[in-house]
């Protein structure tokens, strides 16, 4: 039998083996597990970033609010003429009685319908002396001027506002829930404009008599902010900050 007559062998076909269904399911499960882990890490990173942003914003709002209040409240009853002795008669002439304020009185507070303090602070400035009202504006009129600053809370928009000399209220900061004020007085004296002592008790506006309103040495302000992290477990709905401001006019300081 010659070669041409011999039976021809068919080539061996190698069978290509794919993944079984079980292997595919395991691979998909592992991939989903890894993807879930990545998403959790991403969500945690995003939430941490939001928390840090919210806290930073809260700190900025607290700092701005207290800085403005400090600058203005310390000037309550201030007048530009230096004097060694507190000038009772002169101050009464420079700051005449108006509305609820007595002659010479530089600060006054009352509650609004929601229990928030409406704080009025007035002082005198000379043109170009650099003293700022609550809106951050100096006196550039070319003459002496009185600034009446009225702080209040916009309960609808949760904003601390201020109006100057009867003008419109301007929003200063956001996320304010409430503002309370206590007034530091010397309970042992009823002499008007007595700057010989120091505050020994803090009272609400309703507890102050007319004599006390002319003898306020310091003011304790508490601003309660809406907590940006309030939705997280264990976090309070609000956060309160308290500061005490001394009145320069009560200690004979002329800026």
Regions found by a protein language model. Give the residues of each.
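Aliphatic-rich helix starts adjacent to a transmembrane/signal segment
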Residues: 2-4, 12, 16-80
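Short consensus segments that form the blades of beta-propeller domains
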Residues: 137-143, 236
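Short linear sequence signals and composition-biased patches located at protein termini or domain-edge surfaces
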Residues: 45, 53-57, 61-64, 74-76, ...
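Broad, structure-driven detector of short, well-ordered beta-strand segments within folded domains
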Residues: 107, 147-156, 181
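Sequence contexts marking disulfide-bonded cysteines in secreted/extracellular proteins
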Residues: 2, 133-135, 254
């Amino acid at each position: 039998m010659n070669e041409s007559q011999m039976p021809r062998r068919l080539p061996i076909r190698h069978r290509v083996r794919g993944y079984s269904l079980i292997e595919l399911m395991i691979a998909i499960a592992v991939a989903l597990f890894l993807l879930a882990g990545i998403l959790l890490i991403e969500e945690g990173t995003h939430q941490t970033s939001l928390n840090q942003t919210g806290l930073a914003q809260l700190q900025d709002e607290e700092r701005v609010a207290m800085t403005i209040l400090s600058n203005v409240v310390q000037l309550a009853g201030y007048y530009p003429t230096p004097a060694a002795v507190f000038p009772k008669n002169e101050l009464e002439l420079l700051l005449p009685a108006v509305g609820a304020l007595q002659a010479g009185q530089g600060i006054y507070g009352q509650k609004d319908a929601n229990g928030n303090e409406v704080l009025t602070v007035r002082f005198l400035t000379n043109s170009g002396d650099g003293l700022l009202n609550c809106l951050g504006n100096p006196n550039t009129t070319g003459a002496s001027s009185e600034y009446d600053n009225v702080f209040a809370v916009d309960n609808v928009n949760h904003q601390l506002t201020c109006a100057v000399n009867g003008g419109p209220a301007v929003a200063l900061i956001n996320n304010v829930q409430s503002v309370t004020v206590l007034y530091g007085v010397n309970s042992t004296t009823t002499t008007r404009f007595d700057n010989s002592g120091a505050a020994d008790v803090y009272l609400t506006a309703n507890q102050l008599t007319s004599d006390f309103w002319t003898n306020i040495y310091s003011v304790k302000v508490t601003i309660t902010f809406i907590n940006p992290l309030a939705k997280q477990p264990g976090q309070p709905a609000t956060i309160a900050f308290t500061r005490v401001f001394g009145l320069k006019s009560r200690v004979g300081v002329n800026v």
